[in-house]
Amino acid sequence: MGTLATRAACHGAHLALALLLLLSLSGPWLSAVVPGTPPLFNVSLDAAPEQRWLPMLRHYDPDFLRTAVAQVIGDRVPQWVLGMVGEIVSKVESFLPQPFTDEIRSICDSLNLSLADGILVNLAYEASAFCTSIVAQDSQGHIYHGRNLDYPFGKILRKLTANVQFIKNGQIAFTGTTFVGYVGLWTGQSPHKFTISGDERDKGWWWENMIAALSLGHSPISWLIRKTLSESESFEAAVYTLAKTPLIADVYYIVGGTSPKEGVVITRDRGGPADIWPLDPLNGEWFRVETNYDHWKPAPKVDDRRTPAIKALNATGQAHLNLETLFQVLSLFPVYNNYTIYTTVMSAAEPDKYLTMIRNPS
């Protein structure tokens, strides 16, 4: 864990890396507006769940947050779900893992929202997280992990993107990137242990499956990422938890460690792993690219982000891989596109270099 006394030094490292990234984004890699870094907040896990997110919420206009919730729910949640929302929440609330439900209830109370709306907006984000994730090993055995998170509602979500340091016993237990009001994580790092990102695996009939799975006590996708970051003590333990824990929907979990060969893509069914795809650098397979499609199947021509990413990594070369060049790969169209909300690059062995940059800012 990192002490809070190092926060200023870490912030300086973030700025230095950000400057290098901005200087490197020239030529064919990117034609976008210069990205920006999101705000950084602390969330104390030593505080009661009802108190954890309140300091962060005070930095945002409640009316804007309520508008964001209404827009996401109105667009992502089917009408048949909205029509029976009260009944649904009353049925699944007792099955939702803690402390997440109490945290959501507190956020709702602060914003004068119903618990039903709070739970729905947290679950709605789980339905459409289109992404590109890369885990790779350089020629010296260092592991790097990067991801783009693509999502609708860019004008709103870019304003709600934040980095969060989760504090336990006065130390940084883990770090993640999330949206204000969303208690899960799609991107995170446990310092000196492992990194995780999640990519949606769309199998259809999502809401029906979700409601059925919640009633069985299965975990939401992003909540398991946060739980794993909080509780797992090693790369191996994280992979086991992410592979075996029952989920409300299918997903791809991408995990990076701190030692050579510690990188893997876990293709998940709701009940368990469908496939485990580790790095194999001794046989020249020093990176893994995961978008939103099973890696053993061709990527659809209408959404092939995989092939450009692979070509860019091969052009970069293992000897030249680092966080800056990985960011460049994630800045190549269509890996980077109009729906990209943020890009994160990270390495668990160097946790102070965790960096998220907001893309396509207005």
UniProtKB/Swiss-Prot annotation:
The record marks R147, N292 as: Important for enzyme activity. Pathway: Lipid metabolism; fatty acid metabolism. N-glycosylated. Tunicamycin treatment causes a reduction in specific activity against N-palmitoylethanolamine. Pfam families: CBAH, NAAA-beta. One of its GO terms (cellular component) is membrane. Changing N338S: Loss of one glycosylation site. One of its GO terms (molecular function) is hydrolase activity, acting on carbon-nitrogen (but not peptide) bonds. It is found in: Lysosome; Membrane. Keywords: Autocatalytic cleavage, Fatty acid metabolism, Glycoprotein, Hydrolase, Lipid degradation, Lipid metabolism, Lysosome, Membrane, Signal, Zymogen. It catalyses: N-hexadecanoylethanolamine + H2O = ethanolamine + hexadecanoate; an N-(long-chain fatty acyl)ethanolamine + H2O = a long-chain fatty acid + ethanolamine; N-dodecanoylethanolamine + H2O = dodecanoate + ethanolamine; N-tetradecanoylethanolamine + H2O = tetradecanoate + ethanolamine. Degrades bioactive fatty acid amides to their corresponding acids, with the following preference: N-palmitoylethanolamine > N-myristoylethanolamine > N-stearoylethanolamine > N-oleoylethanolamine > N-linoleoylethanolamine > N-arachidonoylethanolamine. Belongs to the acid ceramidase family. Heterodimer of an alpha and a beta subunit, produced by autocatalytic cleavage. This is N-acylethanolamine-hydrolyzing acid amidase. The lineage of its organism: Eukaryota, Metazoa, Chordata, Craniata, Vertebrata. The gene is Naaa.
